[in-house]
Amino acid sequence: MPSRLPLQVTAFYRLFLVREYESLMVHFSRKNGFILYLIYLLDRKLKGDKADTLDLSKYKKLFGKLYNKVYGINGESFFTEMMKNYNANNEVQQKGLYSALKSIRDDIGSTCDRMQEPAEPFILRDIASHLAVLPERIILPEEIMALA
């Protein structure tokens, strides 16, 4: 008789794309991508039309708090790793940040495709852009909003 294994919880929060009565969960391929996207969502929700390019280096503490809330792990070390500008050979790189941003584009884009929605307002073109989705369309739990 097969034994029942407990369901492994990998995250305490999920992101859904919702249209009227239809919703699809966004499957983030990278944890850093999900947390980074939450930061962009919080920025857009709180600043509205005044949302602008984020200086990500200023978001280490928020990244850590969000990572802890979502995954139950302090994420400041993950942020530091993601933001490294140089590798062990002292060569310029930002592979971690690039990978996180690419995962956001890919993961949000594929969810929008499955829902037959244009991805434009929900994705980031590059590190210098901000989300175009209307702030009133962003619904985040109070405990996430309180961290900002």
Segments from the language model and where they lie:
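Intrinsically disordered, low-complexity protein-interaction/activation regions
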Residues: 1-148
